[in-house]
């Protein structure tokens, strides 16, 4: 079933209002596979793929995605602890708004566990302290943005309460607050988003 689902996820994106690392809100369309954590803590997955054949129908794709997600939710309701909630919500299935002939599928995940189960990739979202408790080796893997000390010792302790996103895959990452520390295989782009396209390995991002 996962193979079918991944084929249906031909893309995910959306032109969204994103804050990035500055205080100014800018309107930037997603142009690559993306993970977003919203101000309210929602986890949204965006994937982008060509959808340029004349016989492709966005409405048919939307119907297929809705069917597949409904089936997934039915079989994985045990991943949700709150009554009235489902593991995944289909946020949108549209053509990309930049005219690039790409389909857009945006999915809201109940939590990181659902994301991992559905996408088959590691993802952790919580505080630095929680990440360390979960067994992630945060120390010595991150350095302050734009150069600076490694996150070790007292500096690590001072940042225990800050948020951290740990993820696999080649994606762009959009966060609601300023990025403070990054692993060596991640970097800020010109929009203040985190470019995680260097490799498939785990990336570490601390923000507040």
Which stretches of residues belong to each language-model region?
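Generic hydrophobic, helix-prone segments enriched in Leu/Val/Ile
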Residues: 1, 15, 62-67, 179-181, ...
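Bacterial N-terminal signal peptides that target proteins for export
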Residues: 1-8
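Short, surface-exposed loop and linker segments with low hydrophobicity and enrichment for Pro/Ser/Thr
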Residues: 6, 34-40, 196-199
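Gram-negative bacterial Sec-dependent N-terminal signal peptides
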Residues: 10-13
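C-terminal motif of bacterial Sec signal peptides marking the signal peptidase cleavage site
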Residues: 17-20
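Bacterial signal peptide processing site
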Residues: 22-24
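N-terminal Sec/ER secretory leader and immediately downstream segment
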Residues: 27-90
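Mature, soluble, non-transmembrane domains
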Residues: 87-208
């Amino acid at each position: 079933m996962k193979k079918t689902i991944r084929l249906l996820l031909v893309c995910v994106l959306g032109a969204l209002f994103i804050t990035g690392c500055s205080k100014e809100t800018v309107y930037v369309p997603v142009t690559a596979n993306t993970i977003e954590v919203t101000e309210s803590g929602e986890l949204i997955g965006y994937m982008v793929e060509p959808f340029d054949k004349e016989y492709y129908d966005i409405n048919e794709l939307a119907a297929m995605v809705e069917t597949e997600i409904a089936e997934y939710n039915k079989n994985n309701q045990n991943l949700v602890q709150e009554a009235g909630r489902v593991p995944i919500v289909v946020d949108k299935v549209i053509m990309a708004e930049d005219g690039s002939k790409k389909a857009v599928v945006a999915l809201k995940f109940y939590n990181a566990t659902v994301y991992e189960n559905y996408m088959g990739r590691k993802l952790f979202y919580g505080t630095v302290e929680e990440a360390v408790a979960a067994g992630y080796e945060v120390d010595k893997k991150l350095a302050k943005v734009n150069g600076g000390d490694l996150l070790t010792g007292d500096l690590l302790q001072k940042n225990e309460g800050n948020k951290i996103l740990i993820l696999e895959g080649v994606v762009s990452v959009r966060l609601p607050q300023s990025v403070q520390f990054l692993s060596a295989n991640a970097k800020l782009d010109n929009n203040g988003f985190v470019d995680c396209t260097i490799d498939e390995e785990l990336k570490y991002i601390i923000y507040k």
